[in-house]
């Protein structure tokens, strides 16, 4: 292992021990902000420190096996050679794992997200597919132990959604979903197609990280806040109260709605959070076009040609065009089994980062 890398791992291990001690002190436990910050740092360091511990234990095992090669018993020497071969392979694997764990982290990886799906090219069929995508992501959230809730929705005339916004909360949500942003293309025979012809439609997906304390100054005078009656499920209650909220940020023309909660106060708070996320994403895009959270770079125009992924229902095939990944298990994927798609994307991203670091 490179000495500088080893020194960095030693420093991280010392910091981990320091944080472990601090978290046990009454001073930190009584300071919720500091306790939360240290707990977050602890969770970030733990996988790397645990892997480094296994690496050092494996090295100690190799030293022990190397010493046994001098044993007069030939059977012991044979076992030592086997142990050396196994240990060296394990060391190589752990060193590779440590390199990945040391890669710079996206500061948004641990954040909750607002996931937006919009029907693009394809009319009614695009709206139906938007509904299918919303359901797919909801099912995936369930599998991950996350919570998914619809913030706002505009239903399609024949089902699905013209637009739907979900808030997904849980552990490391953004890290798993950030590569879902872009144009998703579907090829299938619509239920309204009498001739049995395959149609091509498209939807756009945007992934916006949610910020707890957004450092962005929004002047209340720049906001127009409207209330209206919520539509959709909810029984008679939604017809009696103007609980839904629409907020317009006048300088940027950004409009957000929230009608998920029965409480107008909760809807307003959720809408403000979404507004902040959108404005910040737009500001980041303006400052740095390479930021992955940039919403306009994520979604494109919704044209079929700007695709990151194709869902071909007649063939039961999903193709991710960014990494030339093809999987023939579309039914399972649409039911939320997205790990076989997301994991290769993460691995490719890590490989690109490793190559970039090696090149520099």
UniProtKB/Swiss-Prot annotation:
Name assigned to this protein? Peptide chain release factor 1
In which family does this protein belong, per the annotation?
Belongs to the prokaryotic/mitochondrial release factor family.
InterPro entries xrefs: PCRF, Pep_chain_release_fac_I, Pep_chain_release_fac_I_sf, Prokaryotic/Mito_RF, RF-1
User: Where are the N5-methylglutamine residues found in this chain?
Assistant: 236
> What keyword terms does UniProt attach to this protein?
Cytoplasm, Methylation, Protein biosynthesis
Q: What PROSITE patterns does the entry give?
A: RF_PROK_I (PS00745)
Q: What does this protein's UniProt record list under function?
A: Peptide chain release factor 1 directs the termination of translation in response to the peptide chain termination codons UAG and UAA.
Coiled-coil annotated residue ranges, if any: none
Query: Which compartments is it annotated to reside in?
Result: Cytoplasm
The lineage's top-level taxon is Bacteria
- Reproduce the UniProt comment on modification after translation: Methylated by PrmC. Methylation increases the termination efficiency of RF1.
Q: Which GO terms describe its molecular function?
A: translation release factor activity, codon specific
* Source organism (scientific name): Methylococcus capsulatus (strain ATCC 33009 / NCIMB 11132 / Bath)
Q: Which coarse location class describes where this protein primarily resides? A: cytoplasm
One GO CC term on file: cytoplasm
């Amino acid at each position: 292992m490179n000495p500088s890398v080893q020194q960095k791992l030693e420093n991280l291990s010392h910091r981990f021990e320091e944080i472990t001690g601090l978290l046990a002190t009454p001073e930190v436990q009584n300071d919720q902000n500091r306790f939360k910050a240290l707990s977050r740092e602890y969770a970030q360091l733990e996988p790397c420190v645990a892997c480094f511990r296994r690496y050092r234990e494996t090295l100690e095992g190799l030293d022990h096996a190397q010493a046994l090669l001098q044993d007069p018993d030939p059977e012991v020497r044979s076992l030592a050679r086997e142990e050396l071969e196994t240990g060296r392979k394990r060391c190589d694997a752990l060193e590779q794992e440590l390199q990945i764990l040391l890669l710079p982290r996206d500061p948004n990886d641990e954040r909750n997200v607002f996931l937006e799906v919009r029907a693009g090219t394809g009319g009614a069929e695009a709206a139906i597919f938007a509904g299918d995508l919303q359901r797919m992501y909801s099912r995936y959230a369930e599998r991950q132990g996350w919570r998914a809730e619809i913030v706002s929705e505009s239903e399609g005339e024949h089902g699905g959604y013209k637009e739907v916004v979900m808030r997904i909360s849980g552990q490391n949500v953004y890290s798993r979903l950030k590569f879902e942003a872009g144009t998703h293309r579907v090829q299938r025979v619509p239920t309204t197609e009498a001739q049995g012809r395959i149609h091509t439609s498209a939807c756009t997906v945007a992934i916006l990280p949610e910020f707890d304390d957004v450092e962005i100054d929004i002047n209340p005078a720049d906001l127009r806040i409207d209330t209206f009656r919520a539509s959709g499920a909810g029984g008679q209650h939604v017809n009696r109260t103007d609980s839904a909220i629409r907020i317009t940020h006048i300088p940027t023309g950004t409009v957000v709605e929230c009608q998920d909660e029965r409480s107008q106060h909760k809807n307003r708070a959720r809408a403000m959070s979404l507004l902040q996320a959108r404005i910040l994403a737009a500001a980041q895009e303006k400052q740095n076009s390479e930021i992955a959270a940039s919403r306009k770079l994520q979604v494109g125009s919704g044209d079929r040609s700007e695709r990151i992924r194709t869902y071909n229902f007649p063939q039961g095939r999903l193709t991710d065009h960014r990494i030339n990944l093809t999987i023939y298990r579309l039914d399972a994927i649409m039911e939320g089994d997205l790990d076989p798609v997301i994991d290769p994307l993460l691995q490719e991203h890590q490989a690109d980062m490793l190559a970039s670091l090696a090149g520099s």
